[in-house]
């Protein structure tokens, strides 16, 4: 596993916010990942679908960013630092904290001293938040 400070037990957690940093260029990426995939399956003879929860590929996950994954293949995974920033207990908390981290770090505009982009993020998710959602967010 390549994650720094991974949780030992993920059963009661929903997901995490992460930062991946290229040690060669100093560029980073801020993203999110769920610990489990949850699907509803139809079962023969039953009216309602059954919820199936299984652990995701989070231990070996690198990113959904095509550019970042290309860089990892080119430079080797050992040249990247994978840090878990926050653990979350709900989808709302996961979405909120990812957006908050991306806005606070100004991932779309921040530059390194040499003028290159500091973050590889190309967008910030458009997620609707309201006071009710923000009040429900609890830090783990």
What annotation goes with each model-predicted range?
Residues 1-42, 136-140:
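GIY-YIG nuclease catalytic motif and its immediate N-terminal context
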Residues 34-91:
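Conserved short loop/helix modules at catalytic or binding sites
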Residues 1-11, 86-140:
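Boundary/linker segments flanking structured domains
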Residues 14-16, 72, 120:
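Generic hydrophobic, helix-prone segments enriched in Leu/Val/Ile
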Residues 22, 33, 62-65, 123, ...:
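Generic alpha-helical secondary structure signal
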């Amino acid at each position: 596993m390549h994650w720094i400070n991974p949780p030992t037990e993920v059963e009661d957690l929903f997901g995490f916010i992460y930062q991946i940093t290229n040690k060669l260029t100093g560029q980073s990426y801020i993203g999110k990942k769920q610990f489990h995939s949850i699907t509803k399956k139809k079962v023969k003879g039953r009216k309602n679908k059954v919820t199936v929860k299984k652990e995701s590929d989070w231990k070996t996950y690198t990113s959904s960013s095509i550019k970042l994954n290309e860089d990892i293949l080119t430079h080797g995974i050992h040249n990247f630092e994978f840090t878990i920033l926050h653990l979350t207990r709900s989808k709302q908390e996961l979405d909120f904290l990812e957006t908050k981290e991306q806005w606070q770090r100004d991932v779309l505009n921040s530059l390194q001293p040499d003028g290159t982009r500091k973050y590889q993020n190309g967008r910030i998710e458009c997620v609707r938040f309201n006071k009710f959602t923000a009040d429900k967010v609890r830090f783990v």
